[in-house]
C-alpha cells in the first residue's frame, strides 16, 4: 500500500471513530433527553403493526454498538500497521461513514415524526451497509480475530438494519393509512415475514454468511413473544415465524457443516 493510500485509510479510520461516537451520543440523547420530548420506543407505538417484535428484541443494539466499537478501533489499528490484506478499502470506509450519517439522520427524522423521510434515511443506511458488507466479504477473511473484528460487526449490523427497514416500511404504510390493496393487516405481515426470511436465505446461500440469518431468527422470536402476549393472538403469524426460524436454523446448520468440510479439505 503506497503512502497516500495508507494516509487515506488512517484518516478515514479516525473520522469513522468520531462519527461512531456521534452515533452513540445521538442514540443516547434520543431516549435520554428525549429528542423532541418522546422516546424511540414511544414513537414506534404511534404506528402499531403486527411486524414489530417485542421490546426486548431491541436489546440487540447494545451488542451491535459494542461490535462496531471493536470494528472501528480495529480498523484504525490495521490502517496504522498497514495490514492491507485484511483492511477494508477506503471506499468501504467511506460507506461506513455514510452509515453513521444515515443512522444519526434517521434518529432525528424519526423523532420529529418525519416518517417518510426517515424511511429514505433507513434505505440510505441499508444501501451503505450492503456495499460495506460486499467489500468485507471480498476480503475472504480466514483468521478468527479478523472475522470477529471485521465480518461479525458488519454482518450483524447489516442483518438488523434489514429487519429495521421492513419495520420502517410498515410504519410508513400505517402512517399513510394505506389500504394494502384490501389485503388484511395480518396477511400483509405474513408477506413481509416471508420476504424477510427469503432475503436471509439468499444472503446465507449466496455469501455463506451464518450471522445474517441469525438476526432474522432473533427478530422472529421477538415477533412470537409479542404476538403471543396480545389479547388477539394471530396464530398464523406465530406459525409462520416458527416455520421461518426452523427453515433458517436448518439451512444455517447445513451451510455451517459444508463450510467446515471446505476448511478441513
Where are these regions (language model features)?
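Alpha-helical transmembrane segments of multi-pass integral membrane proteins
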Residues: 18-25, 95-106, 122-133, 150-168
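Membrane-interface capping segments at transmembrane-helix boundaries
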Residues: 8, 77-81, 134-140, 253-265
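Membrane-interface transmembrane-helix boundary segments in multi-pass integral membrane proteins
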Residues: 8, 52-58, 181-198, 225-250
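Central hydrophobic cores of alpha-helical transmembrane segments
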Residues: 211-222
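Membrane-interface helix caps and helix-loop-helix hairpins in membrane proteins
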Residues: 105-119, 176-183, 204-207, 229-235
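Short aromatic-rich membrane-water interface segments that cap or initiate transmembrane helices
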Residues: 45-60, 148-155, 178-188
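Alpha-helical transmembrane segments of multi-pass membrane proteins
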Residues: 20-37
Amino acid at each position: 500500500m503506497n503512502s497516500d493510500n495508507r494516509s487515506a485509510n488512517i484518516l478515514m479510520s479516525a473520522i469513522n471513530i468520531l462519527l461512531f461516537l456521534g452515533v452513540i451520543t445521538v442514540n443516547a440523547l434520543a431516549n435520554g433527553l428525549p429528542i423532541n420530548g418522546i422516546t424511540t420506543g414511544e414513537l414506534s407505538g404511534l404506528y402499531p403493526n403486527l411486524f414489530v417484535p417485542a421490546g426486548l428484541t431491541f436489546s440487540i443494539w447494545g451488542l451491535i454498538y459494542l461490535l462496531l466499537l471493536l470494528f472501528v478501533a480495529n480498523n484504525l489499528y490495521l490502517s496504522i500497521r498497514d495490514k492491507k490484506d485484511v483492511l477494508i478499502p477506503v471506499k468501504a470506509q467511506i460507506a461506513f461513514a455514510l452509515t453513521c450519517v444515515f443512522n444519526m439522520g434517521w434518529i432525528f427524522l424519526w423523532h420529529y415524526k418525519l416518517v417518510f423521510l426517515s424511511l429514505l434515511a433507513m434505505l440510505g443506511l441499508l444501501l451503505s451497509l450492503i456495499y460495506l458488507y460486499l467489500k468485507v466479504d471480498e476480503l475472504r477473511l480466514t483468521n478468527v480475530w479478523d472475522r470477529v473484528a471485521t465480518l461479525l460487526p458488519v454482518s450483524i449490523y447489516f442483518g438488523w438494519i434489514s429487519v429495521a427497514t421492513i419495520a420502517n416500511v410498515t410504519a410508513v404504510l400505517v402512517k399513510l393509512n394505506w389500504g394494502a390493496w384490501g389485503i388484511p393487516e395480518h396477511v400483509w405481515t405474513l408477506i413481509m415475514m416471508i420476504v424477510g426470511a427469503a432475503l436471509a436465505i439468499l444472503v446465507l446461500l449466496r455469501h455463506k454468511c451464518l450471522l445474517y440469518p441469525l438476526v432474522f431468527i432473533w427478530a422472529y422470536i421477538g415477533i412470537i413473544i409479542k404476538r403471543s402476549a396480545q389479547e388477539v393472538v394471530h396464530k398464523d403469524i406465530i406459525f409462520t415465524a416458527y416455520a421461518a426460524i426452523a427453515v433458517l436454523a436448518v439451512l444455517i446448520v447445513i451451510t455451517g457443516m459444508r463450510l467446515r468440510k471446505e476448511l478441513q479439505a
